[in-house]
Amino acid sequence: MIAGYIFLLIAILSEAAAAAMLKISDGFARWQPSVLVVIGYGLAFYMMSLTLQVIPLSLSYATWSGAGTVLTAIIGVLWFQEKLNRRNIAGIICLVSGVVLINLS
């Protein structure tokens, strides 16, 4: 079971990194970040496929999408100086709460 969560963590991290590279790629106009987008998403989906061998789909996908969304928002704030308003923050709190509750069940 621990291996499944390690695979899931790698899937989340690589998906968020790929999303950041997608922004940097400037619509795939810059080839270096574009290559990293493909590698990042490829790794994310491969790790997710390994995760699904151990952790049920409902738990895996909810965690992957929720944690990935939160991590991507954090990257947006830290690297791209994006601003979060109160609704954004409330949404992130809801996502984190949902991911925690799903994993506790």
From Swiss-Prot:
Membrane topology: Multi-pass membrane protein
Main localization of the protein described in the UniProt heading: membrane
Subcellular location: Cell membrane
GO molecular function: transmembrane transporter activity
Keywords: Cell membrane, Membrane, Transmembrane, Transmembrane helix, Transport
Gene Ontology CC entries for this record: plasma membrane
Subunit structure: The efflux pump is composed of EbrA and EbrB.
Function: Part of a multidrug efflux pump. Confers resistance to cationic lipophilic dyes such as ethidium bromide, acriflavine, pyronine Y and safranin O. The efflux is probably coupled to an influx of protons.
Name the UniProt record assigns to this protein: Multidrug resistance protein EbrA
Organism: Bacillus licheniformis (strain ATCC 14580 / DSM 13 / JCM 2505 / CCUG 7422 / NBRC 12200 / NCIMB 9375 / NCTC 10341 / NRRL NRS-1264 / Gibson 46)
Record lineage: Bacteria, Bacillati, Bacillota, Bacilli, Bacillales
